[in-house]
UniProtKB/Swiss-Prot annotation:
<comment type="similarity">
    <text>Belongs to the NAD-dependent glycerol-3-phosphate dehydrogenase family.</text>
</comment>
<dbReference type="InterPro" id="IPR006109">
    <property type="entry name" value="G3P_DH_NAD-dep_C"/>
</dbReference>
<feature type="binding site">
    <location>
        <position position="103"/>
    </location>
    <ligand>
        <name>NADPH</name>
    </ligand>
</feature>
<feature type="binding site">
    <location>
        <position position="252"/>
    </location>
    <ligand>
        <name>sn-glycerol 3-phosphate</name>
    </ligand>
</feature>
<feature type="active site" description="Proton acceptor">
    <location>
        <position position="187"/>
    </location>
</feature>
<feature type="binding site">
    <location>
        <position position="133"/>
    </location>
    <ligand>
        <name>sn-glycerol 3-phosphate</name>
    </ligand>
</feature>
<dbReference type="GO" id="GO:0008654">
    <property type="term" value="P:phospholipid biosynthetic process"/>
</dbReference>
<dbReference type="GO" id="GO:0047952">
    <property type="term" value="F:glycerol-3-phosphate dehydrogenase [NAD(P)+] activity"/>
</dbReference>
<dbReference type="GO" id="GO:0046168">
    <property type="term" value="P:glycerol-3-phosphate catabolic process"/>
</dbReference>
<dbReference type="GO" id="GO:0006650">
    <property type="term" value="P:glycerophospholipid metabolic process"/>
</dbReference>
<dbReference type="GO" id="GO:0005975">
    <property type="term" value="P:carbohydrate metabolic process"/>
</dbReference>
<keyword id="KW-0520">NAD</keyword>
<keyword id="KW-0594">Phospholipid biosynthesis</keyword>
<dbReference type="GO" id="GO:0051287">
    <property type="term" value="F:NAD binding"/>
</dbReference>
<feature type="binding site">
    <location>
        <position position="33"/>
    </location>
    <ligand>
        <name>NADPH</name>
    </ligand>
</feature>
<dbReference type="GO" id="GO:0046167">
    <property type="term" value="P:glycerol-3-phosphate biosynthetic process"/>
</dbReference>
<feature type="binding site">
    <location>
        <position position="13"/>
    </location>
    <ligand>
        <name>NADPH</name>
    </ligand>
</feature>
Length: 331
C-alpha cells in the first residue's frame, strides 16, 4: 500500500488530523507508540484513550513501527514537543516534507520546534501547521482554518496544500515559520492563566483583559525573535489564543482552571493521559524572556503557579498591583 501522507503521533490531535486527511478516501498511515492503540484503530476503528468520540475512517492504517514512516512524502509530526527530537531522529528521515503540528519550546535548550527538526532531519523541508483547532471538531469535519508556514516558500506551500487541504480544513500560506511557532507556544502558557481566572471565578472582564495583555506579551516576545506582527495577529497567534483561552476543551485552560480551584500542577498532570504543553513551555519561555529583557508578567505568574510558590489569588493580586502604565508600547 502506498501512502501520500503519514501522521506521527496518535493522541487526540494526531488522530483527528488522520481522520480529516482520510475524509476523501485517501490512505493515511498513523503511528502510535502504544501497541494497544494500534490494534484498536486497525480492528475497531476507534482510539478510546485519546479520541473516543470518533469512528475512524477505514483508510487509516495504524502502525507502531517508526521505520514505516521514513519514505512517506509528507509527514505530520504530532508528538509532544519535548519528544520531537527523539521521535523524528528515530524515523531516519531523508528528505521529504515534515510538517510540525506540536506547539512548544524545547526544555533545556530553548529551541523552537523547527530548529529541533532541522537538527534531527537536516535534509527534510520543514513547515509548521498552527492555528485555532480543537481535535474533536476537526475529527467531526467542522470548518477549520490554520496557518501553514513553509520554510520552503510558495513551492513547498503548493505541494503541501494539495496534500493537506480538505473542504472543511483550510490552510493559509505563510513563510513566517518563527511567528507561527511563537504564537502557538506562547498561547499555551496564556491559556493556563485564563484557566486560573475561570477557576477563581473572576469573571469575563478579567478574562478579556488577560487575553489582551497576554497578546501584548506574545507580541513583545515574538517581535524580539523576528516574528512578523501580521503572523502574530493571525490564525496561529491571536486566533489560537482566543479559542484556547475560552474553553475547557483546551488541556492548558483546564489545567489552569484546576490551579485556580486550588489543585497542584503535579497532582493534575499526574492524573492525565494527555499533555498540557504550556506547563513545559512556561519556565523555558520565562527564562528566554528574562535573558532578552522582555517583560512577560503573565508568563512569570504562570511559572509561579506551576511551581506552587504562591496561591492563585495571591499571584493574581500581584498582577493587579503592578505599576500603572500605557497600554500600547511593545517595549
Amino acid at each position: 500500500m502506498t501512502f501520500e501522507v503519514g501522521v506521527v503521533g496518535a493522541g487526540a490531535w494526531g488522530t483527528a488530523l488522520a481522520q480529516m486527511l482520510s475524509s476523501d478516501g485517501r490512505e493515511v498511515l498513523l503511528w502510535a507508540r502504544e501497541s494497544e492503540v494500534v490494534r484498536e484503530i486497525n480492528e475497531d476503528r476507534r482510539n478510546g484513550p485519546f479520541l473516543p468520540s470518533a469512528c475512524l475512517n477505514p483508510t487509516i492504517t495504524a502502525t507502531a513501527d517508526l521505520a514505516d514512516m521514513a519514505r512517506i512524502p509528507v509527514l505530520l509530526l504530532v508528538t509532544p514537543a519535548q519528544h520531537l527530537a527523539s521521535v523524528l531522529g528515530g524515523i531516519g528521515r531523508d528528505g521529504g516534507d515534515v510538517v510540525l503540528c506540536s506547539k512548544g519550546i524545547e526544555a533545556g535548550t530553548g529551541r523552537l520546534m523547527a530548529d529541533v527538526a532541522r537538527d534531527a532531519a537536516p535534509d527534510a523541508s520543514i513547515a509548521v501547521l498552527s492555528g485555532p483547532t480543537f481535535a474533536h471538531e476537526v475529527a467531526d469535519g467542522l470548518p477549520t482554518a490554520v496557518t501553514l508556514a513553509c520554510a520552503g516558500g510558495e513551492e513547498q506551500w503548493l505541494r503541501l496544500s494539495t496534500a493537506i487541504a480538505r473542504p472543511t480544513f483550510r490552510p493559509y500560506y505563510s513563510d513566517d515559520v518563527t511567528g507561527a511557532e511563537i504564537g502557538g507556544a506562547v498561547k499555551n502558557v496564556l491559556a493556563i492563566a485564563c484557566g486560573v481566572v475561570e477557576g477563581l471565578r473572576l469573571g469575563q472582564n478579567a478574562r478579556a483583559a488577560l487575553i489582551s495583555r497576554g497578546f501584548a506579551e506574545m507580541q513583545r516576545f515574538g517581535l524580539a525573535l523576528g516574528a512578523r506582527p501580521k503572523t502574530l495577529s493571525g490564525l496561529s497567534g491571536l486566533g489560537d489564543l482566543v479559542l484556547t483561552c475560552s474553553s475547557t476543551s483546551s488541556r492548558n485552560f483546564s489545567l489552569g482552571k484546576a490551579l485556580g480551584e486550588g489543585a497542584s500542577a503535579t497532582a493534575v498532570m499526574a492524573d492525565r493521559a494527555t499533555v498540557a504543553e504550556g506547563a513545559f513551555t512556561a519556565p523555558v519561555l520565562a527564562d528566554l524572556a528574562r535573558g532578552r529583557g522582555i517583560s512577560m508578567p503573565i508568563v512569570e505568574a504562570v511559572v509561579t503557579l506551576l511551581e506552587g510558590a504562591a496561591p492563585a489569588r495571591e499571584v493574581v493580586a500581584g498582577l493587579l498591583s503592578r505599576p500603572l502604565t500605557a497600554e500600547n508600547p511593545l517595549v
